Amino acid sequence: MAEETEKFHIARECASDSDAPPPTCIISEDICEAAGIRYEDAFFDGEAMARAALALSRRDHDPLCRLPFSVSVEAEQYGAKLTLNEKTRIPAVKNFPYKRLQDMPAFQPLDFTKGQISAVLEAVKWLKHHGETVLLELEGVFSILSLLVSSREVYKAVYRNPGEIKQRGAELAERIAEYAGEAVCCGAGILSYSDATISFELVSPELYRDVCGEVTVDAVRRVRRAAPHTMLQLCSATSVGLERADCAVAEKVPVTPGLLYGEALKLVGLNRKDCRLVGHGCQVRSPLRMQEPYIYKLTLR
């Protein structure tokens, strides 16, 4: 019971109470200055983004270089516009491009030659070329949808039109998987899938299992097929929700005591071919010392 409580506590820490998901990695003006780049370029220019990620990794003694610094990389391809708040300088999607899910056209294949996604892939290549291990975070189906329409519309569809959510979710999951495969080809060493927009605690257990969990499991399976030899780490909000809904089973994998979480991910990813899907941890903890010497291997049901 204590172990279960800890898992759920971690999931709540990683989840967001706001309408939009939290930033993937926090980047600051100071980090950009140390990297010799402009703050704005950390979001839109590949080499600048890579230099910022490297500076952040060096400052935090993080064994991983984590990308990107914006949650709108995938959603931008379907109409979301990233803006930097004039006062806080925090990147956000200010206005939703659609009012309803029904207004959205089909999700066409991503164009890897333009926008933020092009810059991210360029950054991955640059970091790989310089000998760094890159963790790339993929936004989950529901997080992307909530940047295109309001979260209220997404939840409304989950309750009232689950068939539409499953259909649009399958389309979007395939696009996410294509992005994952391209990122690995560019040099990403670890993938992370984050979807804190939908929480197990905000819908009924049956609805989560039959709709949200089904959509998420489908997306995870597609990503795994696109990058079968690369570790995929699920954020705690997602992995704990799947386990509670009986969509996945978690198993402790012992690691050397005293490791940073990022070190453990690297070692398990290199040495355990049977452990390519993990969860119950958060990629933002990469530079932090693990309290318990375990990685949680996940098996989807």
Language model segments and positions:
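Residue-level preference for long, well-ordered alpha-helices that form the structural scaffold
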Residues: 3, 38, 42-49, 109-116, ...
